[in-house]
Regions:
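HDAC/HDAC-like amidohydrolase catalytic core signature
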Residues: 1-197
Length: 197
């Protein structure tokens, strides 16, 4: 079986998540994917890196303002502001969640946006989040392309994971819904809703 894997996942290495009112070490961390990669290598499966498909396939699933928020977050978070004269160099966890059902107005403030686009306080945004999530999406897309090229079995080892991510919400350790991105990519390439065995 062919495995698609990228070391960029190491860039998402949050220090803590909020669990039951206590900051705890992040459960979802690089060692999880490293263990799987080691097992894949030990089994003798071939491994390739992802190819860059750009942001267009990501934007086919996720809203543009959300993708822009994630791509520019760290630069905005770390610049000097009224909250920090020297800028913030620590992981970001939301402290407020602007209620979307009352007002569909995206906050302009970075702290407001952090809550607006998140569903929990257990998914830290770090300096390397964009690099890791972009690489994870490219991994899924490369796996989809290899299936299109006739490969019989492909394992896209995506980290951070993506199954909890919505069109414009992150949480549950997930930022981009890699499975949805790959599925939409396959649909856009002419595949039916179901692949034949």
């Amino acid at each position: 079986m062919l495995t698609v894997y990228s070391d960029t996942h190491h860039e998402q290495a949050g220090k803590a998540e909020l669990i039951n009112g206590t900051l705890m070490p992040c459960f979802e961390n690089p060692s999880r994917a490293d263990m799987v990669r080691e097992a894949v290598d030990a089994a003798g499966f071939s491994r390739i890196g992802p190819t860059d498909h750009g942001k267009e396939p990501i934007l086919a699933v996720h809203r543009e303002n959300y993708v822009r928020f994630l791509e520019t977050f760290w630069e905005r978070w770390s610049r000097p502001s009224r909250r920090s004269a020297t800028g913030r160099d620590y992981d970001a966890l939301p402290l407020i969640w602007p209620t979307r059902c009352f007002r569909q107005v995206e906050p302009e403030d970075i702290d407001g946006q952090l809550g607006y686009f998140s569903m929990d306080a257990g998914t830290p945004v770090t300096k390397g989040t964009w690099t890791a999530i972009y690489g994870s999406a490219q991994t899924a897309l490369t796996g989809a392309d290899r299936l299109l090229a006739g490969e019989k079995g492909v394992f896209a080892l995506c980290r951070p994971p993506g199954h909890h991510a919505a069109a414009d919400v992150f949480g549950g350790y997930c930022f981009f819904n890699n499975a949805a991105i790959a599925a939409q990519h396959l649909r856009d390439k002419g595949c039916s809703r179901r692949l034949s065995p």
